[in-house]
Amino acid sequence: MRGAGRQMGRDSRSRSRSVGRRGRKQRSRSRGRSRSRSRSRSRSRSRSRSRSRSHGRSSRRRREHERRRERKRRSRGRRSDSEGEQRQKSRRRSQSLRPPRWHSQNQSSCSDSGEERAQGSWARKGHRRSWSPGSSASSLDSPRRSRSPGTATLALSQQQSLQERLRLREERKQQEELLKAFETPEEKRARRLAKKEAKERKKREKMGWGEEYMGYTNTDNPFGDNNLLGTFIWNKALEKKGISHLEEKELKERNKRIQEDNRLELQKVKQLRLEREREKAMREQELELLQREKEAEHFKTWEEQEDSFHLRQAKLRSKIRIRDGRAKPIDLLAKYISAEDDDLAVEMHEPYTFLNGLTVADMEDLLEDIQVYMELEQGKNVDFWRDMTTITEDEIAKLRKLEASGKGPGERREGVNASVSSDVQSVFKGKTYNQLQVIFQGIEGKIRAGGPNLDMGYWESLLQQLRAHMARARLRERHQDVLRQKLFKLKQEQGVESEPLFPILKSEPSAAHSPEPEERPPSPGTSVDPVEPVEPEEATAPGEAEGEAEGEAVLMEEDLIQQSLADYDAGRYSPRLLTAHELPLDAHVLEPHEDLQRLQLSRQQLQATGDASESAEDIFFRRAREGMGQDEAQFSVEMPLGGRAYLWADKYRPRKPRFFNRVHTGFEWNKYNQTHYDFDNPPPKIVQGYKFNIFYPDLIRKRATPEYFLEACADNRDFAILRFHAGPPYEDIAFKIVSREWEYSHRHGFRCQFANGIFQLWFHFKRYRYRR
């Protein structure tokens, strides 16, 4: 029983415990539910509160917006009132210029009160004045107080501009307030952050930070400083200086003063540095100017030396061409002008005789060469070259006129008819330079005077011919003076008494004292008058004749030719006509037609046999010249070999072979020349090959082929010596050539052969092509 009771008690206790546990669980659940309900209630309350707050904010914003609108309306009304008031004031000021009317104080007050009632509050504030007798009297007494219209207009414009600025400021402020009222929290946060950053930037600029440090913050900087934006205070240094007791504000002021002093000191240092740099730049500029002047002087001497060098080279080329028998007209003229400076060289012919037989192309080349010599000589012998230019141009005009004479009657008339030209030449011929100059001045005066019947073409053509005759006369007189000087020097050196070089023409006194009137150039027709300026010639002719009679009258070249022709006619050099009885018995008489037939037969026989005047050497040179292009020139500079002994010298007389060599020159268009030159300004020509033609017609051993040997040049590695050896009876001959590698391919023009007594060695140099 006891066990059963115990068991029942245990069961009841376990039941009570489980019931208690269930109750506790239910109570905890109810408590959680109540808590969640309270939380939801609090959330709903907070939501309602936030809604009410947002509703209050929106209502507040609406009220503020309505207030701003009301303020705008009021400001517009005030602005309109002020504008009306200003109009009234301007009217009153314009009326104030008139004399004021006297009225009583009551009337003025009444009018003032009426105007105040009409103008509203702005008038009630006392911003307008009323006229009174006293005020008008005072204005009459002191006219300086009355404002002028210009001053009133200026004051009005200033007031309007001030009001406009105030209005703009007010509108800007209202817009900012409106934006602030309607901005979101994010925009507000961004605005405040931007304002803070601008403030920080201004602070950093004031602290002297550069642009590269502007983006640093306490959390983002390469120095790892969490207090970067704060002011660093060095307490130890302050204690050492004894200023640790100062407050932060005083320390900031002290640091600011120190920074200002440092800034001023830096400015001074920077100013001094800039001044030093400026002085240094000025010194460098002065030194550069001095250096330029020195270089200009140095280069000036170089230019002079270069011109003299080119002149020497041109004269040397002329000498070489004269020596080789291929002289150009400019070479002969250069030799003539250089012979004047030489003490012993004598040139018997006038320089313009070198133009005989030249074509138009040759004369044009001569003009270009004359210009080159004039530039190189720099003013020396300028009169000689100018006269030669005039004569050459006249000869070119004559040749072109002859070439154009067969083109028909459509040609333009050249001013002087062919029938009159011979008479003009006879008038100008034989006269001195002074006489021709007088005629030239007379023709110029006639052209300047003009006239209705003056043939300008005739007189201008005559003037052109006269210039050429004057140039010839001047060169002829210069030639005679040079001959006299050379003869005098030769006689002084040889100790011979002075005698005239040519026969003296003794002028008759009758001719000297009774001068005939000078011949006038024939006029082109009845419409043109003869030359008038003959009287000055007649006046000066006696004096000139006397001067010529006193000195030596030298025969000209034309006079010598005329004298020889006269001697020929007087001496009867032609066969004398014989009669039939004067002929010998065995004489065979031929009729003229028989003689002509025999002559023609002889000519035909001679033509069938070939050219009788062409020798073996001429044939050789003709063959050697075949295929000679524009890029090739004759090369005849021989290299002396010194005294060489030959074993066959006692049997055969050694002799040098004849040769005709050519050098091939051209432009090398490498990368450098392509960069710095073009076809208008080409680079200097270089030697690209040689063609040697050695003539061995009389070799003893016909089967022995001539040989060539290439030897190094001892004095210059850039050149080599090419020696030719053939055997008796010819000596070895050598030439100095450029030392470069040869092209031995026949496709590049290489030839080495001996045929018909001519040894030919043709070769070109290799072209180096540089590739990366």
Swiss-Prot record:
Record-level GO cellular component terms: catalytic step 2 spliceosome; cytosol; nuclear speck; nucleus
Location of the protein in the cell: Nucleus; Cytoplasm, Cytosol
Modified residues (Phosphoserine): S148, S498
Residue numbers carrying Phosphotyrosine: Y573
Function according to Swiss-Prot or TrEMBL: Plays a role in pre-mRNA splicing by facilitating excision of a subset of introns. Required for the splicing of CDCA5/Sororin, a regulator of sister chromatid cohesion. Involved in the regulation of innate immune response. Acts as a negative regulator of Toll-like receptor, interferon-regulatory factor (IRF) and canonical NF-kappa-B signaling pathways. Contributes to the regulation of transcriptional activation of NF-kappa-B target genes in response to endogenous pro-inflammatory stimuli.
The family this protein is said to belong to: Belongs to the CACTIN family.
Record keyword Ubl conjugation present: yes
Cross-link Glycyl lysine isopeptide (Lys-Gly) (interchain with G-Cter in SUMO2) placement: K491, K506
Positions of region (Disordered): 1-164, 177-202, 499-550
Compositionally biased intervals (Basic residues): 15-77
Extent of Low complexity compositional bias: 131-141
Ubl conjugation among keywords: yes
InterPro entries tied to this protein: Cactin_C, Cactin_central
Compositionally biased tracts (Basic and acidic residues): 78-88, 177-200
Major location category of this protein: nucleus
Originating species: Mus musculus
The protein, known as: Splicing factor Cactin
Tissue: Expressed in cortex, hippocampus, cerebellum, heart, lung, kidney, liver, spleen and thymus.
